[in-house]
């Protein structure tokens, strides 16, 4: 066999080996066709159940109480933003007491390395301290699912006003303070006259503000707390609550993640007020990296969000508002606007055809607050031409 023939034979043998290896590898890698399945949706909480989630620092969120509730727990006591609906009062109070007990246990003083006399007179005196009381309840709006638990939470809390005390100092305590915008108290008081739905006095706000903002006069649980009025948004008495140290904002009903916002036209709400409120929240917030993270926000309903979520929500509402506004300027009727489907791009994420707040109700509220349905203003009469 010549040298050329040997080389050709070797190359042929190598090619045959490679082809066989490729065929065997392909047989080994043969798998069933790939199939894709949709991940199951997050299960909703069973009715009447409350879920506690940590937000940041000493702040927690309660879900399932009718409205989302933000709870601050610390050395100064307990503060709640909103009180849920009336039927959930006992479970809300149980969740708050659980958080307070856990905080007290985590912050028990460590054993002191001093003499026995000091340990018995100092440490033991604090280890048995009871859980901290509820000091404040903030109402972000007038709705029943936000103020329903006011009475029970107020009566379970304590406010020490100082002054002369005869006897036990605990006897001088009042219930927890309830803070809200003045319009909330005005509307609740107006609906609390003689009648079946009258609210007891303990369910009404004890302190109100009527300016642009209100801040506590002192730190509470290590941070400043401010209430800021959002005029004519969901209603005319909406507030957001800004926890400055932990950088968390309780939004109330100016946003509902996963749903269009409820605009209560009868109580002064408007689409422009909602958009303005969201713009103000975005100005207050700070992102951590590339529009993500940073300031955390708890809306009145739905999951927690950050400033990127709020900006997307604001943009969505602005687009819908501008579409409806253009139709109003063309003197289109409400039925024509609904038929034009101005929310169509977003209905899969935010829309609803049933329940307490539907897509049609949202479109109608936007339409009305933009002046839709009002008779067009009469054109000014022309002056008669002067005779020459």
Where are the regions a protein language model picked out?
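Cap/insert and terminal regions of metallo-dependent hydrolase folds
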Residues: 87-90, 100-129, 144, 251, ...
């Amino acid at each position: 066999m010549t040298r050329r023939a040997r080389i050709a034979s070797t190359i042929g043998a190598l090619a045959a080996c490679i082809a066989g290896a490729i065929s065997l590898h392909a047989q080994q890698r043969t798998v069933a066709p790939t199939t894709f399945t949709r991940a199951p949706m997050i299960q909703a909480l069973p009715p009447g159940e409350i879920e506690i989630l940590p937000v940041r620092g000493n702040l927690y969120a309660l879900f399932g109480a009718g409205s989302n509730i933000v709870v601050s727990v610390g050395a100064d006591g307990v503060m709640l933003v909103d009180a849920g609906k009336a039927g959930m009062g006992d479970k809300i109070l149980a969740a708050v007491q659980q958080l307070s007990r856990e905080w007290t246990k985590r912050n028990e003083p460590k054993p002191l390395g001093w003499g026995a006399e000091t340990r018995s007179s100092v440490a033991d005196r604090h280890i048995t301290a009871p859980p901290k009381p509820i000091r404040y309840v903030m109402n972000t709006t007038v709705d029943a699912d936000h103020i329903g638990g006011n009475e029970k939470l107020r009566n379970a809390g304590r406010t020490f006003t100082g002054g002369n005390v005869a006897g036990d100092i605990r006897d001088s305590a009042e219930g927890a303070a309830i803070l809200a915008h003045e319009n909330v108290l005005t509307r609740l008081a107006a609906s609390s006259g003689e009648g079946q739905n009258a609210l007891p006095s303990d369910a009404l706000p004890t302190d109100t503000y009527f300016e642009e903002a209100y801040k506590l006069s002192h730190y509470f649980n290590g941070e400043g707390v401010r209430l800021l009025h959002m005029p004519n948004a969901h209603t005319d008495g909406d507030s957001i609550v800004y926890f400055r140290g932990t950088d968390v904002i309780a939004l109330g009903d100016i946003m509902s993640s996963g749903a269009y916002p409820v605009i209560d036209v009868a109580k002064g709400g408007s689409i422009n007020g909602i958009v303005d409120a969201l713009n103000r929240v975005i100005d207050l917030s700070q992102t951590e990296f590339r529009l993500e993270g940073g300031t955390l926000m708890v809306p009145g309903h739905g999951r927690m969000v950050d400033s990127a979520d709020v900006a997307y929500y604001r943009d969505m509402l602005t687009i819908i508002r501008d579409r409806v506004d253009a139709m109003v300027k063309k003197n289109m009727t409400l039925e024509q606007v609904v038929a034009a489907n101005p929310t169509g791009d977003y209905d899969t994420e935010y829309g609803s055809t049933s329940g307490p707040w539907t897509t049609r109700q949202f479109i109608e509220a936007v339409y009305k607050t933009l002046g839709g349905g009002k008779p067009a203003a009469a054109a000014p009469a022309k002056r008669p031409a002067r005779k020459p």
